Amino acid sequence: MNNPARDVLKEITRAADFGFDFLDLTLEPPAARADRVDAKRIRTGLEAKSLGVVGHTAYYLPFGSAFDAIQTAAITETERCLEVFAEVGATLMNLHLDCRVPGHDPSFINRRNLESIERLLPTAERLGITLMVENVEGDDAESLAPVLDALPMVGLHLDIGHANIGKGRKSNTESLLKRYGTRLKHVHLSDNKGKSDDHLAIGAGTIDWRREMRAVKATGYNGTFTLETFYGDSTLITYSINRVRELWASLT
């Protein structure tokens, strides 16, 4: 994934130099906001490096806001992202459900998230982009069900790091894939120690990667994986890439 604080074109080169097959392009401030990037130059840069692209949006867009104007602003910003992603060649774009709306219960928040996605679907369909919901910390199949069950055309974006956070909790990967494995569209990979979203190199935390990757492979999935390791030098990134590829190839 590109670092949104850095120039996108330089991040394309960096992704190619590491040997990635595609760029998980996040459109968010400070340097990669949708209305501030040059989509044509990004597409040219991706094509020059023979990289595919997957669309990613900011995790803090307030789709569940109790203020109509703020919810609408979040939708408008995401529609802007959709337009950019279509121009650069993406066919997938993720969303994070809003889960922090003070003074309102989960049913209200779920309803607002659902409304937001329903308003985004016509633009996504027009542009040929499939929307997918990424699980955040604490999400399991039950917590995502009010939205995903109501929107069968929306895919699952599995974040294995997020699925392994929570004191006293087991991994939520199994429950998510048991219910939505046939809708899996994209996977994020990063390690942690079970307490916070550390974005560590693969093997630096406590996640059982053989168990997690076996669960993914059992669904028949053979799509894209993003190594979402934000900390450490290039050696750790290269190690993580090789570890994931070797582990995936070893599973039957």
Where are these regions (language model features)?
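Hydrophobic faces of well-ordered beta-strands that scaffold small-molecule active sites
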Residues: 1, 23-25, 53-57, 93-95, ...
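Alpha-helix-loop-beta-strand connector modules within alpha/beta enzyme cores
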Residues: 39-60, 114-124, 151, 209-212, ...
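Short, well-ordered coil/turn segments that N-cap beta-strands
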Residues: 19-21, 47-53, 88-91, 125-130, ...
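N-terminal pre-domain/capping segments
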Residues: 1-82, 86, 142, 155, ...
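Active-site groove signature of glycoside hydrolases
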Residues: 85-105
